[in-house]
Amino acid sequence: MNKKQKKVLARIIIAAVLMIILHFIPVKGIIRFLLYMVPYLVIGYDILKKAFKGIKNKQVFDENFLMAVATVGAIAVALYENGDYTEAIAVMLFYQIGELFQSYAVGKSRKNISELMDIRPDYANIEVDGKLTQVDPDEVAIGSVIVVQPGEKVPIDGVIVEGSSTLNTSALTGESAPRDAKCGDEIISGCINMSGVLKIKTTKEFGESTVSKILDLVENSSSKKSKSENFISKFAKYYTPAVCYSALALAILPPLFRILFMSAEPQWGSWIYRALTFLVISCPCALVISIPLSFFAGIGGASREGVLVKGSNYLETLSQTRYVVFDKTGTMTEGVFEVAGVYDNTLDREKVLEYAALAESSSSHPISRSLQKAYGKEIDRTRVTDIEEISGHGITAKVDGVSVAAGNYKLMKKLGLSYSETDKVGTIVHIAIDGSYEGYILISDKIKPTSAAAIKALKKAGIKGTIMLTGDSRTVADSVAAELGIDEVYSELLPGDKVAKVEELLARKGSKEKLAFVGDGINDAPVLSRADIGIAMGAMGSDAAIEAADIVLMDDDPLKIAKAIKISRKCLRIVYENTYFAIGIKLICLVLGAVGIANMWLAIFADVGVMVIAVLNAIRALFVHKL
């Protein structure tokens, strides 16, 4: 508990003790009134103060106003009729207990999320004259060498230049299994170094590092509100004035009706009491507090599992997802290409690889990198001229003055060359040198071990259709789709074709159904932003993914997609439970209050009791590990 909460708790205890003592003091009249005002002011002075401020600022209709009017009115009725002030003070007392509980619950949720996302480093170690000096991470320039000792957080993204260790990435990915890291490996901020001392050359400033982007994303998620939250805000705006005027009508109209049409006693005290009970019941705290708390807890629970959601609106959209579209490379497959062989070549294997690697040297595409890796020597780019990249086909260039073409069968057709056709599964890179076909290079990409299980999990979660888009050949695409159990596959697509295909798929679905696109974030930004919900996978260290997507999965496990959908559905289920429960109970109690069956004690349950139950239910959204 913080200082403010402890102060409220002390006031609750003092007021409760004073009420018990006063119960046994047999005094009447004005002295009884003055004595009971002591516990009332102890417990309610801040509510009265806020209500007065609201009236002064012309922001009248809120829960403080409702409680102030209800309790002051109840005291006035008690003073006029029987001198029993217990109910009025009990209303304020239990309201404060409910508020304290809500404050504690929200604080606890925030603390849980802060602990789960406790990845912000406090300092970075820099070696000066053989001694380690702690500096603020913001002060470390790009290219500096920092030292991370066992047990410390990696403060800034970089590359390991000395040492090896195991890293705990659980705060980022939700996975407890440690990862090995060695010299030459890229390392991201937010990981915890578990064993050896590491020297890291920074590649980013702290503000641009992974840890800063993640924290910024999580902290700003509450600004993007869901339809449910916006509905509750609008509902409260009109609901509170409506119940205030209804209570006023309940206090005045029935007595007037009795006087004018029944020639009976007006029973002002009885009807004012009913109106005050009506006001206490009508307080919208349960909805106003529990709905945002449900989303807040849901986003926190998701972040614990390595699923970062940029706002509750995206969580709501994800819960309605019925179609999932995947990019193949890096999403369903490892995205780590390796040369599996060189075929139908007349030149030496090494020579074919040399020409291919040099021709592709200006590209950062994974296939280009795999060719450079297979070549195994340092690339001398001065040997390469006249590079031309032909979208959807491949590359032409001159290597040592020799014309080289490397690409798919479309490129060979464009150049008017006959080529070898093959049924081998993998990416085929055909090579032509000085206008003569020189064979093809087979490049393979492994399917991720959990991809098939991920598709099954999605279908079990009620996903109607799984679709894969790829620029790869039809043979490769069909083979991967068949192995994984994917419903539809579209192959040989250019980057622009993927957007058009997603547009086509969006037009096919129902109006209330949502379509999610899952990519690795490297070149999928247009498609991620076009889908109803964009999900970037394996985003550790990928700025593009964190910027472009609505939801970011921090590791490469496709099983997390189904988990993210289950988390969103649990969160929305809790939101609906709280909405229906709170509105249902309040409507019943409002009717009972209006006809005189409900008293102040039932009103207290309808307000404070419902709020406590709704808040407890909302906190369940934090616990999603077993989904």
Could you tell me what each predicted segment is?
Residues 63-70, 172, 273, 283-359, ...:
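Conserved catalytic phosphorylation-site environment of P-type ATPases
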Residues 339-465, 474, 486-502:
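P-type ATPase nucleotide-binding
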